[in-house]
A protein has these predicted regions:
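Gly/Ser/Thr-rich phosphate-binding loop
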Residues: 1, 28-33, 42-110, 123, ...
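Short, P/G- and charge-enriched loop/turn segments at secondary-structure junctions
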Residues: 107-114, 166-168
Length: 263
């Protein structure tokens, strides 16, 4: 097995076909990258004109991780590449995927916005602020029942105490991922945000990732981010920031109104 490392941007080096050139030249079978890279390509080349210049007949799968993969980007990549686009979730601490659609076992149905189900070796749970286990579709902190499977981090370098305090103390018997989300009725895991990205609006715990998912569905939006700001009445309010696709001519005021209405 050979790994090709590409150090550089997926656009502007010299164009939005940088990934396709590497895949074609080296007969790459699988690509692992962050959703941001594909959002950047989609913004610069929404119709895939650069993609059509290269032979990607050996390419078999795209794996997206490192941040939340919005459904619109996944669907765009599927349409363009005609191969499985797999949104999976793992952490530096775990060294390998916690949840994924495993191509080597049996491909499961894709649920856009979900990182699929826990892979063998992981028992993933959702815990609410009151320390109780969440019901299906209830938002909470994502944890993994101990012991962790082989290959995950056994401690922190010269910091055994900090390892225990940071990861194993807040939820007894569980590894705390510091990610937030929910598990649906079918066992699919939905990673919505980091725990510090949950905002409280008038007593309602809202996921910035869930709001970003809605904004990204607007046909003119290439990238978006949602943050919480202080509000005297409601505690916090969500503020959305959007970057438009290349070539959009619709005025900003109209797009803003449409985005607010969608949310």
């Amino acid at each position: 097995c050979t790994t090709v490392l590409f150090e550089g941007k997926p656009v502007g080096t010299p164009d939005a076909g940088a990934f396709w050139k590497i895949i074609s030249e080296y007969n790459v079978k699988s690509l692992f990258t962050a959703p941001t890279a594909f959002r950047a390509i989609k913004k610069e080349d929404p119709d895939g004109k650069f993609f059509s210049k290269y032979d990607l007949s050996k390419f078999e799968a795209l794996f997206l991780a490192g941040e939340r993969a919005d459904p619109d980007t996944i669907k765009w990549a599927e349409t363009l590449l005609k191969v499985p686009v797999i949104d999976h979730w793992w952490q530096t601490e775990t060294s390998w995927a916690i949840s994924s659609n495993c191509t080597g076992i049996e491909m499961m149905k894709t649920k856009y916005g979900s990182a699929c189900k826990a892979v063998p070796g992981y028992d993933v749970k959702i815990i609410k602020p009151d320390q109780s286990l969440a019901k299906p579709n209830e938002m909470g902190d994502i944890v993994v029942k101990l012991p962790l499977p082989p290959g995950t981090f056994p401690t922190l370098w010269n910091a055994d105490k900090r390892y225990e305090e940071n990861y194993m103390t807040n939820y007894k018997g569980y590894y705390q991922t510091y990610d937030a989300g929910h598990i649906d009725d079918d066992g699919y895991i939905w990673i919505m945000s980091r725990t510090d990205d949950i905002i409280n609006v008038a007593g309602h715990r809202l996921s910035t990732g869930a709001i970003e998912e809605v904004l990204s569905e607007h046909q003119s939006v290439a990238e978006c981010a949602v943050i919480g700001i202080k509000d005297q009445l409601k505690g916090q309010l969500p503020i959305g920031l959007i970057a438009l696709k290349a070539g959009v001519t619709k005025d900003n005021e109209t797009i803003t109104k449409e985005c607010v209405q969608m949310v």
